Structures are given as structure tokens and as C-alpha cells.
Design a protein with these regions (language model features):
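Membrane-interface transmembrane helices that cradle and orient dolichyl/undecaprenyl
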Residues: 3-4, 97-100, 139-155, 189, ...
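Short helix- or helix-capping micro-motifs
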Residues: 18, 109-117, 162, 166, ...
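Membrane-interface alpha helices of multi-pass inner-membrane proteins
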Residues: 47, 110, 142, 154-169, ...
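Transmembrane-helix motifs of polytopic, lipid-linked glycan transferases
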Residues: 79-100, 138, 142
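Short acidic/glycine- and proline-prone juxtamembrane loop motifs at membrane-interface regions
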Residues: 118, 124-132
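Transmembrane-lumen/periplasm boundary regions of multi-pass, lipid-linked membrane glycan transferases
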Residues: 164, 173-270, 286-289, 340-344
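Signature aromatic-anchored transmembrane alpha helix within multi-pass, membrane-resident enzymes
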Residues: 313-355
Length: 508
């Protein structure tokens, strides 16, 4: 069979833009250091399970396999999210074709997918979020094909993608709920009389079932995690602020494209379901009042595709031919200068100056103070120095105390840093009360001798016979609460640590 029409037609432009996306990430991959969450995920990957306090197991399982094959250098760690991001660009191009668009529409939509600042952020570091965008985009393409073709094949594919997506991040439930609502509210409801949708739902449920069993066995820790994060960590966001942040996170340059795309989807009898998915998820997030605005970022690929196809159709009229160059100019002239906001392409001092020059400073999405860098970059600084400082305290102890000394970290970033960088400085594994570290327990430490990292300066004094402030962290570009964090040397916990463990649990 001659494959040239496929490569020269439907895939040529998306593949080119996907390659550009990969090139951008390759330029930035080692510019700064390991991100806080990456260090934690590496610790999780050493302890495989069917679930974790703050996420399902799929991305951690992928990381475990990846570490076995290629190690855990920055390049080894980050090629997978970059590939997932490139896959999202490719799927966006295929969505354009499925919606009737041609090469210009593919070029415009895929260019949008490359330049989205928040997608650049999540595709730079290893996390479930890069795969989440990929699964949402692929699910949208398969849903459209399933509704168009009426065959079982696309429905089976959709079920598998939904199931894997759920094993990656439970927010895939929003897609499933939005798709079900869209089918019920449109003429596509007739497909509910066929096997396809029910088979897809069954497959997704079966794939997700082991994680549900894990949740039951562990007392539904993720529900506690979500409740605490919503109440104590997320910033309250109103309707206007939510949509203002959508425009900012997705880039003002891309706003006209996705707005046209949303209108085009809702006006389309054939693809209205995809528009309803977006609207229903957005409505849910706005109604919650405290969700992070970037949660909706996973749902934009169909909007870019539909918007680009609509602009291409409108520009087919000679009187509106100007739409093509104007659309490309807006996307490029405004979108390109924002790339260093999403990717650490610049040395840190130049980034600080550049962000001040263009007036970009992201609004905090959590209840924390920002430093000179936004949190997505600040959390890449200070971790090895933290381990080095803890090691100095640890090795200052007599051998008898070192043998029973535990290192208790206030949060999973600090604990992950001790676990990752600690072996080169002769440190034992860390323990922590934060998220999945709490499930791993105190590991036999009694509290007789503890090095406590982080927290408030008055935290441990009432619990120990002796408390010494041994050192403090010092990192210019890290998050302010990590700079100057105390490192305590504590002796004589007033009760066994195993007994205190339940009291100090913190899921958020």
C-alpha cells in the first residue's frame, strides 16, 4: 500500500510541529535542576503500588520502567513528558483532519499546541500532567471517530484510553462525565442503544478497578488529600478570575483561536459533544470556586483544532483571505515571546529580567508566597544544597547516634531530595508525614535522635528533651518557605515515634 499520501497529507504538518516541540524541550531540559515533584516521584517509583495518596499508579510505573532502562538523569527523566507533549501536538493535527480542516488549519492548530505556556510547563518535568493532556486529547479524537463510524473498534480504543487515563489521573472522570452528558443532550444519544459506549465504560472501569481496591484497602487517602488541598491549599477563584487566568495560562495569543473553536464545536451537530465536554468541565471547576485554573488546560486540543478549521473555512472566501496571515501573525508575534515563560530556556538571572521586561508574573495558584521566580521554576532550586547541609549535621553525630538517627522532613520535596541526593553524602533514607511518605511509616525510627528538616522554628521544642537549631537552608531562587528553613537536631522524643505517627499525618 502506498503510504505517501498519509505522510504528505494528514501527518506531515503535525509531525513537523511535534518535532519543533521536542526541540524546544531539548534546549531546556538541563537548564535548571530537578523539580520538587520529580524527586518525590522517584521515591514513589522505588515503592511500586496500585496507588499513592496523591495519584494513581500509571505514571509512577512508567517512571520505574524508565529508571531501569535509562536511569534518572534530567534528560532520562524528562524525555517521556516531552514525548507525551509531542504526541498531543500530533493528535491536535489529527483532530483538525477529523473536523474537516486542511493543511493551514493543521499548521495553525499545531502551532497553538506548541506555544501553550502551561503545556510547555507540564511537558518539561516528569509528572502525570503531561500524560493527562495526551490522554484527554486522544480520548477526544477517539470519541469523535466512535460517534462518526459507529464501529466497535473506536469504542474499544476509547475505553482503553479512558481506563489508562484514569490510572494516570482521576480527573479523566470529568472527561467521561462530560462525554456522557454530551451524548445525552445531542442526537448522538441513539448510540446508547448500541454496545459501543457500554463496552467502553466497562473497559475503563475494569482497568481502573485495581486502584479503587487500593483506595478501599488504605482508607480512601486520596479523598482526604483532595479535601485538604481544596480547603487549605488552593486559592479561591471567582468566575472572572478563572477565565482571566485561562486566557493567561493558555496565552492571550491563542484566545481567539480556542474561543472560535468552542463556538464552532457547540454549533456543530456532529462534534457538539466535544464542546459540551469542555463547557461541563469548565462549569464544574468554576462552581467549585477553589480549583486550580490549570485543571482545564487538558481540554483545549479539540478547541484549537475546531478553531483553526473554522478560520481556514472563513478564509476560503477571498474577502476574508486576510484571516490566514493575521491569525498566524497574532499567534507567532504574541505567542513566541511567551515561550521562555513556560520553559526555562534562559539562565535564571536573565529570566528574572525578561519576565520583568514583558510584565509577566503568574498569579499564585496555591496559598504560598512567591519569590523572584514562579513556583514552577523556583521548585527546581536548592535541593542538593539541602541534602548537603543535612549531611553535615548527620556526620557531626557520634557513630552510636548516627546508627539510630532518623531524618524527618516536613514535606515530600525535602524528603525526596534527601532520598535522591542523600546517598552521595552518606545519608539514610528520609521519613516524612507528608502524603505517601506517611504511608511508608517511620521505618523503625524511635525518635531518640532525629534531624528534623523544615517546619516552623518553634515546632519541635515541646516534644523533645533537647532541641538544637543546627543549620538553616540557603537558596536564593527557591520558594521563600524553603529558604531559611530550619534544620533541627532533636533528642529524646517524649513518646515513641510510631505512636505519634497517626497524629502528624498530613495529606495535601
Amino acid at each position: 500500500m502506498d503510504r505517501r499520501p498519509l505522510l504528505s497529507g494528514a501527518l506531515a504538518v503535525p509531525l513537523l510541529l511535534a518535532a519543533i516541540k521536542l526541540a524546544l524541550h531539548a534546549l531546556a531540559v538541563t537548564q535548571y535542576g530537578y523539580f520538587r515533584d520529580e524527586l518525590y516521584y522517584i521515591a514513589c517509583a522505588k515503592r511500586l503500588a496500585w496507588g499513592y495518596v496523591d495519584q494513581p499508579p500509571l505514571s509512577i510505573a512508567l517512571l520505574a520502567v524508565n529508571r531501569t532502562l535509562v536511569g534518572d538523569s534530567l534528560l532520562a527523566l524528562r524525555w517521556l513528558p516531552a514525548m507525551a507533549g509531542a504526541g498531543t501536538v500530533l493528535i491536535t493535527g489529527l483532530l483538525v483532519r477529523a473536523l474537516g480542516g486542511g493543511r493551514f488549519a493543521q499548521l495553525l492548530a499545531c502551532l497553538c499546541a506548541v506555544l501553550v505556556p502551561i503545556w510547555l510547563v507540564v511537558d518539561h518535568c516528569f509528572s502525570m500532567n503531561a500524560f493527562d493532556t495526551f490522554f484527554w486529547s486522544l480520548a477526544a479524537l477517539l470519541l469523535l471517530r466512535a460517534l462518526d463510524q459507529g464501529r466497535l473498534g473506536p469504542w474499544i480504543g476509547l475505553g482503553v484510553v479512558l481506563g489508562l487515563g484514569l490510572l494516570n489521573k482521576t480527573s479523566m472522570l470529568w472527561f467521561g462525565g462530560g462525554a456522557a452528558l454530551g451524548i445525552l443532550l445531542t442526537s448522538h444519544r441513539r448510540v446508547l442503544l448500541a454496545r459501543g459506549p457500554w463496552l467502553a465504560a466497562t473497559l475503563a472501569g475494569l482497568l481502573f478497578l485495581p486502584h479503587v481496591v487500593w483506595q478501599v484497602q488504605n482508607g480512601w487517602p486520596t479523598l482526604e488529600f483532595m479535601r485538604n488541598a481544596t480547603q487549605n491549599k488552593m486559592v479561591r477563584t471567582g468566575f472572572v478570575a478563572f477565565w482571566t487566568q485561562q486566557i493567561t495560562l493558555m496565552s492571550p495569543a491563542l484566545f481567539p483561536v480556542w474561543l472560535v473553536g468552542l463556538g464552532s464545536l457547540l454549533a456543530s451537530k456532529r462534534a457538539r459533544v466535544l464542546g459540551i465536554v469542555f463547557v461541563s468541565v469548565a462549569g464544574l471547576l468554576v462552581a467549585s470556586g477553589s480549583s486550580r485554573p490549570n485543571y482545564l488546560a487538558v481540554a483545549y486540543a479539540p478547541l484549537f483544532a475546531a478553531g483553526a478549521a473554522a478560520i481556514e473555512r472563513a478564509a476560503a472566501d477571498r474577502r476574508r483571505g486576510w484571516l490566514r496571515p493575521v491569525a498566524m501573525a497574532v499567534v507567532l508575534l504574541i505567542g513566541l515571546p511567551l515561550v521562555p515563560v513556560g520553559l526555562p530556556l534562559l539562565p535564571v538571572e536573565r529570566y528574572v529580567a525578561y519576565s520583568a521586561l514583558i510584565g509577566i508574573r503568574p498569579r499564585p495558584q496555591e496559598r504560598t508566597q512567591e519569590g523572584p521566580l514562579p513556583q514552577v521554576f523556583a521548585d527546581m532550586f536548592g535541593w542538593e544544597d539541602l541534602a548537603r547541609r543535612v549531611a553535615r549535621v548527620y556526620h557531626s553525630l557520634p557513630e552510636a547516634e548516627r546508627e539510630k538517627c532518623g531524618i524527618l522532613a516536613d514535606n515530600y520535596g525535602q524528603a525526596g531530595a534527601i532520598d535522591f541526593f542523600g546517598p552521595r553524602y552518606g545519608l539514610p533514607p528520609a521519613i516524612s508525614m507528608h502524603n505517601n511518605y506517611w504511608l511508608w511509616g517511620p521505618r523503625g525510627h524511635t525518635g531518640d535522635v532525629l534531624i528534623i528538616v523544615g517546619g516552623r522554628r518553634d515546632d519541635p521544642h515541646s516534644d523533645f528533651r533537647e532541641v538544637v537549631l543546627a543549620d538553616t537552608t540557603n537558596c536564593e531562587y527557591c520558594m521563600p518557605y524553603e529558604n531559611g528553613a530550619p534544620i533541627f537536631l532533636c533528642r529524646g522524643l517524649n513518646q515513641p515515634l510510631a505512636r505519634r505517627w497517626m497524629e502528624i499525618r498530613r495529606f495535601n
